[in-house]
Amino acid sequence: MGNEFDISNAGGLVPMVVEQNARGERAYDIYSRLLKERVIFLIGPVEDYMANLVVAQMLFLESENPDKDIHLYINSPGGSVTAGMSIYDTMQFIKPDVSTVCVGQAASMGALLLAGGAAGKRYCLPHSRMMIHQPLGGYQGQAADIEIHTKEILNIRQQLNEILAKHTGQDAETVARDTDRDNFMNGTQAVEYGLIDAMLDKRPVS
């Protein structure tokens, strides 16, 4: 169950891993092999196809072992709110804890998904960048329809702010103010804000 959206962006050059056992050899693409280790990649813009793959992988891993953590690695500029919310809701719905790790960037919806990981298990690597802001609009059409869409985007903004407030420990007013414009954070700032729990230099010793 590899991440085809990652593969296409890499020009089709996907490393293969060959495993040997008593029954012979089996080749996996690198993403499928890491899925066996309960590692999922959320790479690139958040859109419906990518979200479906991530959701499917989480549900599969829950069916395999509902008591073992899932590790979600995020490097995303954000994207579709509805696609992102399908991932977020699944993260909250399934039994396993979902540990989130930012590698590169987690902006907009990517930052919300990073913050939505299991409490105490949200991380970034040292040179990662996080960014939170309000959802973007841009609907064109009749005045009545524009008014409808304006109300909807304001409702979505409030919903996203409430989610960020829940996971960061900030109050809703603070989040509303801090997301009014693009708000970039490094790892230290993200920890202080409550977006993540720790910045990792090395993999923790198990």
From Swiss-Prot:
Query: What name is this protein filed under?
Result: ATP-dependent Clp protease proteolytic subunit
Major location (coarse):
cytoplasm
- Identify its protein family: Belongs to the peptidase S14 family.
Q: Where in the cell is it found?
A: Cytoplasm
Keyword terms of this UniProt record? Cytoplasm, Hydrolase, Protease, Serine protease
The entry's cellular-component GO terms read: cytoplasm; endopeptidase Clp complex
Q: Which reaction(s) does its UniProt entry say it catalyses? A: Hydrolysis of proteins to small peptides in the presence of ATP and magnesium. alpha-casein is the usual test substrate. In the absence of ATP, only oligopeptides shorter than five residues are hydrolyzed (such as succinyl-Leu-Tyr-|-NHMec, and Leu-Tyr-Leu-|-Tyr-Trp, in which cleavage of the -Tyr-|-Leu- and -Tyr-|-Trp bonds also occurs)
Q: Which HAMAP family match?
A: ClpP
Q: What GO biological process, any one, is recorded here?
A: protein quality control for misfolded or incompletely synthesized proteins
Q: Which top EC class is given?
A: hydrolase
Give the record's subunit note: Fourteen ClpP subunits assemble into 2 heptameric rings which stack back to back to give a disk-like structure with a central cavity, resembling the structure of eukaryotic proteasomes.
- Active site, UniProt feature: S108 (nucleophile), H133
Which InterPro entries does the record associate with it? ClpP, ClpP/crotonase-like_dom_sf, ClpP/TepA, ClpP_His_AS, ClpP_Ser_AS
Origin organism lineage: Bacteria, Pseudomonadati, Pseudomonadota, Gammaproteobacteria, Oceanospirillales
